């Protein structure tokens, strides 16, 4: 594993001095100053032996919360060992690193290799994984083209989630929406051959009741084009409300809140 250090702008000069002339020369060559997301790669015999990532300053981090990992996309996929004693910095970087690994590769024949991170002790990796898995579920649902993400597919995603976390799920579909007094859902989707539905997922028995509601209008690619052409490409995101609720539900259930 390649040691990886988080170095703020104010720390850069001392950190380089502690590592000697070779590191200082490398920083000059690579124009590295600790700017947020900047990568300094220290090598021996042409191989990376240590990485420093610019942690920037307070202003930079406020402007770009996850900007610290921006430069990692230029690095080959490998295992990094995070060397960081500040727990808050280590946790924030681990979350940014994990979120930065997202790729929508559902239709890819071969998924590209991904970098891995060894976190220092004290970082709650399970919590980070729960957050990231929920985020990735939301992104996958939104990124899936409309022809593969209709009401039935959205229901299937909810059922998979319910099965994984032993949650209860009920679905009201098509004409039954009128019988159960959900006329607006039925009205919006009745012209499509893909029947509209109300999906309800319930989990947990203790604590205050929290209800999350997300609109899941799955765009029908065979419908009439009533919007300006330039806006049609983003219509697959019209079900993003439901995707966000499912992703958040996954975070909550995976964290056993």
Predicted regions and their residues:
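N-terminal hydrophobic/helix-forming segments and targeting peptides
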Residues: 1-218, 231, 251-256
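Short acidic, Gly/Ser-rich segments with clustered Asp/Glu that frequently serve as metal-coordination loops
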Residues: 217-225
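Acidic/histidine-rich catalytic neighborhood of metal-dependent amide-processing enzymes
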Residues: 224-257
């Amino acid at each position: 594993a390649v040691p990886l250090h988080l170095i703020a702008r104010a720390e850069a000069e001392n950190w380089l001095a502690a590592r000697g002339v070779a590191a200082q020369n490398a920083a000059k060559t690579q124009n590295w100053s600790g700017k947020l997301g900047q990568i300094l790669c220290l090598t021996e015999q042409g191989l990376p032996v240590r990485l420093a990532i610019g942690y920037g300053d307070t202003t930079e981090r406020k402007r770009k919360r996850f900007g610290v990992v921006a430069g990692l996309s230029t690095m080959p996929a490998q295992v990094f060992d995070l060397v960081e004693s500040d727990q808050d910095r280590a946790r924030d970087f681990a979350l940014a690193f994990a979120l930065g690994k997202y790729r929508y590769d559902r239709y890819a024949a071969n998924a590209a290799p991904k970098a891995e991170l060894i976190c220092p002790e004290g970082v709650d990796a399970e919590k980070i994984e729960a957050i990231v898995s929920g985020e990735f579920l939301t992104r996958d649902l939104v990124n899936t083209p409309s022809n593969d993400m209709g009401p039935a597919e959205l229901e299937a995603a909810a059922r998979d989630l319910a099965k994984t976390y032993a949650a209860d799920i009920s679905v009201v579909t098509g004409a039954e929406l009128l019988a159960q007094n959900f006329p607006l859902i039925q009205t919006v989707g009745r012209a499509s051959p893909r029947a509209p539905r109300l999906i309800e997922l319930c989990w947990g028995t203790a604590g205050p009741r929290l209800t999350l509601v997300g609109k899941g209008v799955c765009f029908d690619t065979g419908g009439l084009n009533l919007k300006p052409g330039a806006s049609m490409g983003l219509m697959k995101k019209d079900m993003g409300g439901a995707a966000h609720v499912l992703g958040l539900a996954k975070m909550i259930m995976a964290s056993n809140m």
